[in-house]
Swiss-Prot record:
Its main location: cytoplasm. It comes from Staphylococcus epidermidis (strain ATCC 35984 / DSM 28319 / BCRC 17069 / CCUG 31568 / BM 3577 / RP62A). GO terms for cellular component: cytoplasm. This is UPF0298 protein SERP0712. Keywords: Cytoplasm.
Amino acid sequence: MNIIPRTSLIIYLKHMKHERQIRKYGHIVHSNRQRKYVVMYINEADADNIVHKLMQLKYVHDIQGSPYKYLKKTYEKEKHEIQ
């Protein structure tokens, strides 16, 4: 079984009524009606194409990528903590 690398996008919409239309681009895991955003998981291989298609939609205000792959995942004690 292969694990497909996925990434999350935070998509800010102008109106939440368009949430249903963007379901075809990925898997929606969270939506906030007050702040008008949707958190969606997509395949990393298709990320560039999907972001390009989403930005062309009139009702998409902004798209932010997940910072997870840039975070440090192994934690070690810092030099000042050892002493």
